[in-house]
Amino acid sequence: RRQRARRRQFALLGLAVLLIVLIFAFRHLISTPQQSGADGDTGNSGTSATEEVKQVAKAVNVYQSVMYYQPVVQKYAEQNGIPEYTDVLLAIMQVESGGKLTDIMQSSGSAGLPNDSLEEESSIRQGCTYFAHLLSKGKSLDCDLDCIIQAYNYGSGFLDYAAKFNGVYSTELAEKFAEKQSGGNTIQYDNPMAVQENGGWRYAYGNMFYARLVKQYLIE
């Protein structure tokens, strides 16, 4: 009888251990996020890489070479507290490099470094950090998003300038700032948007078409 009782105890103990193991395994399975992206270190609450790309692609229409970096952009956007601007950052990357340059967001200058001195991920990290700074300053000055996007190209001083005009972006506002900063000097610019509007030129400071170039890759 004692042996039977012991066998029952061992059997019950074994079943209890097995049940605990199964419970932990199941909880781990449902709580582990799927990894995504070029470097495989960005998770998004169980969303697969393909699903993430489709979600962003609904808001932004850019080259596949840019979409390749979407998980990295999203990671640093989240670190800077601006995940909802991931699509805007991808559109900025499209205009800056088309996803084909090493300093992929052309952000070296905003960090006080020589141009084209950052590698891809460092460039994305700095680009996201800089945009977050512009976003914070722009909001404090009541500037709209187009002004903030234009400031990525012109520098944060454009936000101070725009704030004097109620912080509302316009083509004329961007042109006047570039005219002032360039001393009225112009250069040839063969972008189709410029060719259609003025025959193909811009002021020799930044790119007065910048916000509009970025916005053409965003799907409203």
What are these regions (language model features)?
Residues 1-53, 60-66, 114-125, 129, ...:
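Non-catalytic cell-wall polysaccharide-engagement segments
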Residues 102-105, 162-164:
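Short, solvent-exposed loop/turn and secondary-structure capping segments
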Residues 77-86, 142:
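Short, charged helix-capping/linker segments at alpha-helix termini
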Residues 83-100, 107, 127-128, 148-154, ...:
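Short, functionally critical alpha-helical segments immediately adjacent to catalytic or ligand/cofactor-binding
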Residues 105-113:
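Short linear capping/connector segments at secondary-structure termini
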Residues 57-65, 70-79:
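Immediate post-signal-peptide N-terminus of mature secreted/exported proteins
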Residues 69, 88-89, 210:
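Hydrophobic side chains within well-formed alpha-helices
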